[in-house]
Amino acid sequence: MACGEKKTNSPSRTPPVQERNAMSSSLFFFLLLILLLFFFTSPTGAAFFFALAPPTPPAHLRFEEANQFHNSDICPSASAGVGRATACDPSYVHIAMTLDSHYLRGSIAAVYSILWHTSCPDTMFFHFIAPAGGHDGDDDELPGRLGSIVRSVFPSLRFEVYTFQEELVSGLISSSVRQTLENPLNYARVYLADLLDPCVHRVVYLDSDVVVVDDVRLLWDDAAARLASAAAVVAAPEYCHANFTRYFTSAFWAEGGARVFAGRRRRPCYFNTGVMVMDLRRWRAGGYRRRIERWMEVQRERRIYELGSLPPFLLVLAGEVEGLDHRWNQHGLGGDNLTGECRWLHPGPVSLMHWSGKGKPWDRLDAGSPCPVDHLWHPYDLFIRPSSGTDILAFFILYWSS
């Protein structure tokens, strides 16, 4: 060895400090794994964890934020900003829908489809009708909470949430062939003229189980032209080939029910109230709310129909509706009211698909047994499927072992 040269030895083992650090890291990750196992598999742990976390919507009400859409150059100018202060702008297309926790997923998909396909998304104004309180004490259905979820999904959407006092109609509802048809919110469409600002002269009412695959302004403009040329209060696709008599009991017809429709402007035909354009000024002036309520009172005294909110509309309006193209309500995609079997689209062009009937696309997709037509609804679904505690735990295990 040369004079002054310092002797060095190659390390044969990890220095004590590094070894202690490695042991500490392993112990930390082991303890983290135990804590995660406790948090996500123990009810007590999960409750403690989520109590510390920021408040978030329940798992069945979580949605991703929608893409932003903007007006094309051909669109009419609208007031700046969002909110009810500009609801009276004459350039707006007014769309009314109901909101509740079970159908919220459908409502959000419907809104997304409308924004997706219209050339003027900034001119859409939505009017959401929500129950005053949750059904059976379910606070998830409080109007403010539902409105907050809608705002989180569509930050720039112009909308208003209206509280529907269900006691207005609950005493008039009779039993139906399907329990969901007895929900008071199904009758909110009868009260739109009372709920919305008087400056809103016309509104498109849509059920929550629809998606629009065309520009809704085409529906709006066509209905406006048809309503202006007639004394009608409602424009909707009509189906005169349907057996109209089956919507009422044999006792109704035996007792002279046909006289109800005498003197109408045209032959009374079936129309689906899940897609209709309403002239609210004529609705108010003609006292249509009270006309429908009177038939519901008759139904409570003696059964004259079986199908929830539809028959009273038919009794008052069939034969007085301005017909719209069938493309605006490809209905029945949810099957019938009892079995919900799969159905396909009717022949002809499609601008709006409607899963009326028992089967809803989100329920069938989640159950792993979708109908072919349900896959046409799926691209508009913004629902975030909840991850189980096992899924989260597996993620951490894979991450730290990689």
Regions found by a protein language model. Name each.
Residues A2-S402:
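Glycosyltransferase catalytic domains, chiefly GT-A lineage
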